[in-house]
């Protein structure tokens, strides 16, 4: 698959407007400021392909990027940013429920968490969306480069525990900054897209 053949397709505020062409959808989810856009950019080796928001909570729609006419990378709106009005938070909740309930959308999930901190209550809710969907997913612990070597294993264990991840769910340490974990995540995504 040619990752350089990537294009932004559309930004939707309703699941009814999601592409219906049957291509696999690899959905990226995570709280505001966890680095979803940066991870997508690192995967594609493109600096500013997925917009990196200056302010957290900037991605309020579902953004679709088509890769080589073979799959979509789906950037779900970030969550958990305190300054977002309650009405927006409720709209986010409805949008996520609709996306996860639509059987023709999600193929595979990539849930991002911050490797430095324990997952938040919102992260637990997001992990449950994935677990209840029955669709396969991985958890990516981003910002690995901000940890000391001695902190990596304990932090990964805490993430797995707080999110109640079954052993079958892969946890990938990642650095969008340095590229650690890129090859592993890419392999997992390409494998999922071919199923």
Pin down the residues of each PLM region.
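Conserved C-terminal guanine-recognition region of P-loop GTPase G domains, centered on the G4
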Residues: 94-169
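Active-site glycine-centered loops adjacent to acidic/histidine catalytic or metal-binding residues
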Residues: 75, 142, 175
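Hydrophobic aliphatic residues
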Residues: 43-47, 100, 163, 189
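Flexible beta-alpha connector loops of hexameric P-loop NTPases
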Residues: 79-89, 116, 145-148
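Helical mechanochemical/support elements of P-loop NTPase systems and associated helical scaffolds
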Residues: 22, 48, 61, 72, ...
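Conserved G1/Walker A P-loop phosphate-binding module
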Residues: 1-83, 194
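Residue-level signal for inorganic ion chemistry
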Residues: 65, 142, 185
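Canonical P-loop GTPase G-domain recognition
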Residues: 3-15, 146-195
């Amino acid at each position: 698959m040619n990752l350089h053949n990537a294009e932004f397709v559309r930004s939707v505020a309703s699941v009814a407007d999601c592409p219906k062409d049957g291509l696999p959808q690899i959905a990226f989810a995570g709280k505001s400021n966890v680095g979803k856009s940066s991870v997508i950019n690192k995967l594609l080796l493109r600096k500013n392909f997925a917009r990196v928001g200056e302010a957290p909570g900037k991605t309020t729609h579902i953004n679709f990027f088509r890769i080589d006419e073979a799959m979509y990378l789906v950037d779900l709106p970030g969550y958990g940013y305190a300054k977002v009005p309650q009405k927006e938070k409720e709209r986010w909740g409805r949008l996520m429920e609709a996306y996860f309930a639509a059987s023709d959308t999600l193929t595979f999930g990539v849930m991002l968490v911050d490797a430095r901190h324990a997952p938040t209550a919102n992260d637990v809710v997001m992990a449950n969306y994935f677990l209840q969907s029955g669709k396969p997913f991985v958890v990516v612990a981003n910002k690995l480069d901000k940890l000391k070597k001695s902190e990596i294993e304990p932090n990964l264990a805490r993430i797995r525990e707080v999110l109640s991840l079954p052993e079958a769910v892969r946890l990938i340490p990642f650095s969008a900054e340095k590229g650690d974990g890129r090859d592993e995540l890419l392999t997992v995504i390409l494998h999922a897209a071919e199923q």
